[in-house]
Amino acid sequence: MKIKIQKIHPNALIPKYQTEGSSGFDLHAVEEVVIKPHSVGLVRIGICLSLEVGYELQVRTRSGLALNHQVMVLNSPGTVDNDYRGEIKVILANLSDKDFKVQVGDRIAQGVVQKTYKAEFIECEQLDETSRGSGGFGSTGVSKA
C-alpha cells in the first residue's frame, strides 16, 4: 500500500519501518516538548497523510517508552481516519515522577495501518443470552482456573 505524505514542518521525517518484520513504523517529534510528571503533552509529528478508503492509522505506544520512562500514548491506540488531512499529533502521558523531555527527531510513538469495517447497527428488544450475561469488570476473576 502506498500512502501519500505531506511534510508541513522542516524537521518532519517520513515514517519508515525499522525491520523487515515490523508491523509499526516510527513517528518522530518535530519540536522539543517537556511533559511534566503526571501530565500530558501534545507532540507534533509535522506530517499529513492520505490513507485509502477502508483503512485507518492507529497511533500506539512504543514499548520502550512505556517500560523505561512510563510514557504512553494517552488514547492508545489513537485513530487517524482515512478522511482526515490535518497534521498528525500524538497525546503523550507521563506517568512518572520526573520531567520527560522530547527532543527533535525522537521516536515518540508508532503507527500501524489497519483495515476498517463498517457495521450496520440493528435495534432490537432483547439480545441473545450467553453464559457470561452482563458480567464485566473483573467478573471472570484474575486467578488461574
Swiss-Prot record:
One of its GO terms (biological process) is dUTP catabolic process. Its cofactor is Mg(2+). It comes from the Bacteria. The keyword Magnesium applies. InterPro entries: dUTPase, dUTPase-like, dUTPase-like_sf, dUTPase_trimeric. Substrate binds at residues 62-64, 75, 79-81, 89. PANTHER family: DEOXYURIDINE 5'-TRIPHOSPHATE NUCLEOTIDOHYDROLASE. This enzyme is involved in nucleotide metabolism: it produces dUMP, the immediate precursor of thymidine nucleotides and it decreases the intracellular concentration of dUTP so that uracil cannot be incorporated into DNA. Belongs to the dUTPase family. This is Deoxyuridine 5'-triphosphate nucleotidohydrolase. It comes from Helicobacter pylori (strain J99 / ATCC 700824). The lineage of its organism: Bacteria, Pseudomonadati, Campylobacterota, Epsilonproteobacteria, Campylobacterales. The gene is dut.
